[in-house]
Every structure is written in C-alpha cells, then in structure tokens.
Swiss-Prot record:
Function: Maltosyltransferase that uses maltose 1-phosphate (M1P) as the sugar donor to elongate linear or branched alpha-(1->4)-glucans. Is involved in a branched alpha-glucan biosynthetic pathway from trehalose, together with TreS, Mak and GlgB.
Highest taxon in the source lineage: Bacteria
Keywords: Carbohydrate metabolism, Glycosyltransferase, Transferase
Record GO biological process: alpha-glucan biosynthetic process
Keyword Transferase: yes
Record field: catalytic activity: alpha-maltose 1-phosphate + [(1->4)-alpha-D-glucosyl](n) = [(1->4)-alpha-D-glucosyl](n+2) + phosphate
Oligomer status and interactors: Homodimer.
Pfam name, any one: GLGE_C
Broad EC category: transferase
The organism of origin for this protein: Methylacidiphilum infernorum (isolate V4)
Protein name: Alpha-1,4-glucan:maltose-1-phosphate maltosyltransferase
Amino acid sequence: MKMPSFGYEVEKSFLPVDGRKRIVIERIFPSVDCSDFPLKRVIGQTMVVRAYVFADGHERISVHLAYRHIADSQWTEISMEELGNDEWEASFPLEKLGIYEVKIIGWIDHFQNWLEKLHKLAENDKDIAVELSIGIGLLEKNWAFSRSQELKDWIDRLKDERLSLHQRLQLIKNPYLEELVQKNPDRSLSVESESPLFIFVERSKAQFSSWYEFFPRSWSSVPGKHGTFKECERLLPDIAAMGFDVVYLPPIHPIGKKARKGKNNALIASPEDVGSPWAIGSAEGGHKSIHPSLGSLEDFRHFVKKAADYGIEVALDIAFQCSPDHPYLLEHPAWFKWRPDGTVQYAENPPKKYEDIVPFDFETEDWQALWEELKSIFVFWINQGVKIFRVDNPHTKPLAFWRWVIWEIKRDYPDTLFLSEAFTRPKLLYGLAKRGFSQSYTYFTWRSEASEIKAYMEELTSPPVVEFFRPNFWPNTPDILAGYLQYAPPSVFKMRHVLAATLSSNYGIYGPAFELCVNIPLEPGKEEYKDSEKYEIKTWDWNAPGNIKEFIAKVNHIRKLHPALQRTENIRFIQGDNPRLLAYVKELPGHGDPLLIVVNMSRNTEMGWIHFQPESVGLDPSKPYQLTDLLADVTYTWHGEWNFVKLDPEACPAHLFQLSQDGSFSP
C-alpha cells in the first residue's frame, strides 16, 4: 500500500506471514538495546525475566520462557507467571559459565478458554453435548501438534459412545487431563520473540575483584637492574596480605628499539633507556614472546602458578599495537598504513605523537587474517594459564572486532575475563561494554566532588547501564596522577581508596606508587607522574615511612567479610547537611549486614548531620542502635534519624559502619 510520509511516498506492506497468529510479545526485560547485546550475570545467580505479552480480546493465553546454554541442543521450558496488566515473569538458575539464550513463546490457550466456558454451562444446567464435541475437537488439535499417545488415549475414551454425557463430563473435569493438556498444548499458532535474549554468565571474579598493578622490571634484588619473574615471586605474599586477588602486569613482551622513548617520554633515548612496555616487538619477538630480561616462558608459567598458591590470578595487558621493529611489519606489511615516502604511519592523537608505536590498519584488505592473528594472541596466553586480560585502548579498534573476538573466546574459554581500558566518550565506552567486556575502566578517576560521585554512581547503577556495564574503579594508573592526588597527603590517598573499594565491587591500584603516596606530577597542569615508571626502571622502598599498606589491607579484609561490598548496584545515598561528607548504604536484600559508609571528601576536618533512617535496614527507630566503625574499631550509639558525624582526615578520612541493635547485627 502507499503511505504518505512528509511529502513523499513510501511503499510498505503490513501483511503478516500468518495473520492467524494473534499473540503480541511487545517487550522483554531486562535487555540491552532491545536484545541486540547480551546481559551480564555471574554463575550462581538467578535470572529473572519479564515480558509484556497479550492478545486481542479476553481469551486466556499461555506464556512460556525457553532457555538453554549454547553448548546444549535442548531447550528447557518453564511457564511464566502472570503479574497483571499483561506482564509475565519467570526465573531460572544460571548454573554454567558461558552464553545462555532465552526466548519467549506465547499462544492462545483455546482448551483452557473452552474448559472455563464448559464449567459455567454445566453449573447452569445448560445443554453441553455440542460443547463437549467442540472440546474433543480442540483436544484433537493438541494431539495433532504434540503426538502424545497418552492424550490420544484420553480422546478415545471421551469419544466412546458407550459413556453417558455425565461420564464424559467427569472425564473432562479430571484435573489430570487439564495437566496433560498443559504439557501437550496446541502451539500451531504460537508466537516466539523475534530476537533471542543472550546472557554472558561469567565467574564471580567478574563481579568482585581487587587488582594490583606493578611493573616486574622494577623489582630486581639489585637496584637499577632489570627485574625478573623469579624475583617478583617474593612480592606475592605482601600483595596477598594487602588483600588483592588479581595481579595485573603491563606488557611483558620484547620492547622495540626503533624510536624508543627515553625517560619522561623523551623523544631521544639513551643506550641505557629501557623504553615503554607498550611499544611491543623487536627482533627478539612480538606479542607471543617474553622480554628476555624478564625470563623465559617457563619462568612466567611458574610465576602464574606461584601466584595461584596465594589466591592471586595474573592478568596480562593486551595492547594491539606494535613498535616500528615488530616482526609483524616485515611478515604482514599489509596490516599497517604506509606513507608515500615509504615510512610506516606511527600512532597520533593530535597534538600527541607516539613515534614508538605503530597501530594496525583495521581497514586492510587482509582484515580477516589480522583478526584471526589477534585472536590467536589471546589463545596463546590462555594456554599459558592466563584467564584475565586488561585490554589497552580498545576504543581505537573496531567495535565489530571486539564483539567477534570476545564471543569467540567466551565460547571456547568461558572462564576468560576482559577488562576494557577505554578512557573515551561515554557512548563509545558503553558500546565496548555491550560487546562483551567483563569490566571497564571509568571516569571515577576524575570525579572528585560528592555531588559528582552521586550522579555518576546513579548513572552506573540504573538501567540500562547496570545490565551490561561493570565498573572497575582506579584512583591512579601509570598514565594518570589525578589532580587531587598531586602533592596530596596520605589521607587523600586513603580517602580515594575507600571510595574506590566501597563504591565499586571491582577496583584496582597502580602500585607501589599508590600505597607509597607518590604525588609529584611531571609538571604543573599535567596528569603524568614525574619520572614515570613507564619509561624507566624504578627502585622502590615498599615499606617507606608514610605508606598506607596496612590501611589498604584492612579495607580489603572488610570487603571480603561483607557481601554488601561485593556488589556495585546495591548502593543508596544518604542525605546530610554538609556537601563535603558523602554518605551511602551498601546492602544486599535477604543477606542482612548492611553497611553505612561516610567519607570526608576534603583535606580538612569536616562535621555535619547525617539523615539516616534506621528502619530502612530493619532497625527499630524507637530504640538506640550501635554503629561499629570497622576501620577504627570504635562503636558509637545513635538515636533516631539525624546524627552527628565528625571526620578528621589525619586520623581517618572515613567511617565504615556495621549496624547493630540490642547486641544483634542488623537483619
């Protein structure tokens, strides 16, 4: 038919393939962009799905949810419960790692509608002979669809002319027949949801993890010498004691010699300069090789196993870029852009230039071979025992590539996790998460005011973002010494650590710069560290005076003891009269043990009144209640809703309260 549209004609037909199908499945939720992208969950959770399903008129409908793991051929179907207003709900357990597929199926329940009509007629002594014949016809349709022999036997009995009308009616009223029909419905005119709902089910570390980043080359037992994996094994007990369960290593590959950067990112390197680990590749190897000064592949595997002995996983940095002397440039020149003068195009982000890094050309005609090779890098390191990858600058590679490669890896290695390091525009940042990244760096690093933190957390913990984006909060990185940490006292480092570790269930620090409170920038107005470890070997005194290792260990210990801190979305902000005091509750419904956190966001002593409603966490508001500060091991007694707080950052910049009343912790 012709449809006028803003002055021009559009041809459109709304003729369905089968107009007899009357069910409408209008919405399934939760979903990401109308099920274009997978939801994120962890193993052991219960997946709750709702849908709007209805039909014209007043007839009863049946709605089922079907689900399966993609490794399984068979679907499991469960009935959905009607909640009212044409909303339906069902839930099922997520028992396997990997990818689940979900669809909704609906149909008119003609037999149930007929049965209700029959009961009404029988109650009013109406003639039901014709209605019984109609019912038998409906049962025959059910049998034609399901081919259930048991249902066929019931139909034959109902058609037995030796039975009286009353006897047939009693057979029809038998609850077992109704149950049998429900198991064998006539779904010849059923409707399925147009797009399947996919769910990435990951292991619990996708939801709760504590990351510690360090440069292995800086940990030789001889100051100034290049460290090795063997020497780094001595760090593991202290890292574990601080409460970290992921050790993240910057790239461990050979570093290019051409255009190598010197100290503080100098354009000209001296012969002694070690270069940036992100300038990957030399004559000694590329992305599947280990820098010879770090040790051998066997040394690396031993380091991974040793870390596991302390409950720590090793995460590797995957940076899909090359130095100018990476073997790929000779072996696959088509994977790079070449300038008219015959030189390769190095990386640029004007006005910044990265002469020591050459990006891949993802528009190459040989793109499929490039994609397969990059996938093989993940597989290679998975085979060395690595199951967590921090991906460098994924926003500079096509999103279609990430969707493909993460799906491929997740299908074959479902326990693999991916952290996206993309400090970029919000839609691009979220777009990467939608395509499968388990966790993502965030803008937390630049949120310094209480109002900014509140607004940002509300964004991250609200639909639709909460369904696909898992934040990982980092107060610092080798590239970023945020302004509020520059020249800051240890109390500010403690404050940012408490925020990162209690706002988000996933967080990380770059150490030992963080716990040693390194606070000197390259120059005023810059976020880079002075004498950045990216470009030189450092010698660290890990136990130097003023370090906050014990404080970090205490916070991480509290995180492990209290499930409320092992989720991100379960946050509720509390109002107060001082904008420099940030207060919030973390709780898991049904688990008890809610926590109240109050953080001083300034460098000065702050005080104010907090409006906390004790009944919101199950406490009796008519009685006093106790708050035990898990950081200071001090207990306070509060009364009612408004209570006074004073925080001296030099003593401790935060309260982390556990709530109790009459000697019992909050239910």
